Amino acid sequence: MSTPTPDNSPDLLRELIAFESVTLTPNIELIDRVRALLAQAGIPSTLVADPQDARRSNLFASVGPLDVPGIVLSGHTDVVPVTGQPWTSPPFEATERDGRIYGRGSADMKGFVACAVMAMIRAARQPLARPLHLALSFDEEIGCVGVRHLLRALEPMQPAPLLCVVGEPTLMKIGTGNKGKAAYRALCCGQAGHSGLAPHYVNAIHTASDLISALRDVQHDLAEHGPREPGYEVPYTTVHAGTIKGGTALNIVPAECEVNFEIRNVAQDDPNQILARVLDLTRTKMRAAGALPDAEPPRVTTVNSYPGLATPEDSAGVALSLIHI
């Protein structure tokens, strides 16, 4: 049984807000609703689900000729949690005040999703010279998790799109760049022993402190001498240690210490090269501090990463966008 198609984007936004598609929870009801609306307009769509949970899914759809490069409208369907926040209206009910619609995700970014879906439906009635594509993803808020599956599925797509418009909230300004990010977990290993004999054992926290010191030194060098992109509030690559956990008791030399850190890089910087610098400097600091011969450097694993974006401001895509803002 079909349900009526909304008359406009605000009406669809009200529907979308009602789906509690919080990150890491199922979004399939929202996706099914969008898919049904597209089908009613004669637009086929494809789902690319999370391999571990089919209730979380991406959606991809196209209208127009597929033998020429087109434009992608891309948005995520997940929203951040509302727990513990002082909402004055139900977060998953659209509330209109003073010409604005309030609700979780109204700006980030179900408002754009609603506009994109309605644009697809209207485009299906037009003789398009280029295709219009719709890409909806899940779990963007925790590191663009869902779209990775979608991108792999779209790799064979030919011809590649001419332009992708990602409708994140920008106060209607055109954003041409975004820093890349790489998050890491470092396990620093030592040897447990009584603190009265501490010099005989490798102290994992000491290794972690050498790592953190190296992070600070590399950060200082990047701030002073690294490439700069003036469009950002912090115009250079940053490194940051966010959490540290280690040790079991004051009188026991710690056998393990875990440090979680990240690199947020401008497009000109390679996070792999920065990580290599950090680890080389960590080893240098360990030797300088007189680390025992069997002390090993931190074991680093990548938790999450995504590349940065640097679109030339004189590109055809930016020029096209400026015409329609």
Go through each PLM region and give its residues.
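Short helix-capping segments at alpha-helix termini
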Residues: 39-41, 125-128, 156-159, 285-293
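Metal-dependent amide/peptide-bond hydrolase catalytic core
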Residues: 4, 185-324
